[in-house]
Amino acid sequence: KRVDFLNFAVSELSLKNAKAKHLRAEEAGEKLLRGSADVVVARAVGQTNILLELSIPLLKKHGIFINYKGKDLSDVETAKTAEAALNAKKTEVFNFCLPFDVGERNIVVYEKIEDTPKIYPRKFGTIKKNPL
């Protein structure tokens, strides 16, 4: 349903070169969409090192990964090994507070600086057991 809505929005807004697909990120990053996206977005769904391994392979060189996080950024600092292995670099962190005292949030932006080694992304079970 979410993908249907996103494709409807793309159509209504007459966006060119934009489409929503329902895929597992690790499958898309292996072959289908590897190196094809200008921007990948994730919202507070997991550890940063795991999200990087799933998202960075989808990006073109100099593409941007936008990671919407909660208040706690401790896992961002521990993801430096993943950044190096995947040829990505943290470029910006935007901190803000939601209205009505809902809480503090962060947007962490990464750039893919070189092609991702072909060994990434690994199978999801491997990523979970042995994160970068």
Language model regions located:
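SAM/dcSAM-binding transferase cores
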Residues: 80-132
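Active-site-proximal loop->helix
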Residues: 7-12, 76-86
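Helix-to-beta-strand junctions that scaffold the AdoMet/dcAdoMet cofactor pocket
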Residues: 59-61
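Conserved beta-strand segments of alpha/beta enzyme cores
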Residues: 17-19, 64, 89-92
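Short glycine-/small-residue-rich Rossmann-like dinucleotide-binding loops
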Residues: 44-45, 70, 114
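Short gly/pro/ser/thr-enriched loop/turn and capping motifs at secondary-structure boundaries
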Residues: 2, 72-75
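Conserved SAM/SAH cofactor-binding pocket of Class I
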Residues: 1-46, 52-55
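Short strand-turn motif at the edge of the Rossmann-like AdoMet-binding core
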Residues: 68-72, 96
